Amino acid sequence: MYFVGTSTKGETAGWTIWWQIDDQMRVRTGKLMAYKEDGHRNKDLRYSFNFVHAMLAKAGQWDSNAYEYKGCLFGLHLVDAFKDAEICIVESEKSALICQAFCDPNKRLWMATAGKSALKRERLHPLIDRNRYIVLYPDYDGHEEWVAAAERIDYPRLSVSEQVRKYHIPADGDKADMADIMLRLVCAPQETEAEKACRLLGLQEIHEGVATLIDKLDLTID
């Protein structure tokens, strides 16, 4: 569905490549990112991201005078495959991939800007030209910036979601995004009926016998 690869070259070996492919199936570039085992970007390195076109230029294999680089939304190549889907846009490619895993692409199709400041009308042109409905899902610390960007873009079928701010908790951190919220809500241990009773009654703990009774009788606490 998405085009994701792995670098095998030099000091970027093992890095993830997020390929930017446009609505005409043309490869614009690939963004290379270094991640730790926990899935977070490896900021311990001298640098932790790069672009394929920049690496080619450095190696003398890209003539910047002959080719004009213009990035596009990650996932844009899917726009015509799911013609009725609402377009959901986040900042991170990784987040788009995770969010899509929880959604039907016929209803919600996730894309990424590949950078907070990359949200511009030019990037959204292929979607605007198709009159698609677009919902922005900014990171927790980037909400106001994307609200301002949406106002500048001035497209009537563009809105900014409040979901990240609505479901955010302090433990998520200021850099949390929609994927972080989804993973926490979906993967969190389910509350037992005994725990629910304890919470609703404002108790620190519930008597073991009562908890056992709730479990044995399969009681539901409303």
Describe the function of each predicted region:
Residues 11, 17-130:
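Phosphate-handling DNA/RNA-contact segment within nucleic-acid enzymes
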Residues 84-85, 94-222:
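TOPRIM fold recognition
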Residues 3-11, 38-41, 166-169:
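Low-complexity, polar-biased intrinsically disordered regions enriched in Pro/Ser/Thr/Gly
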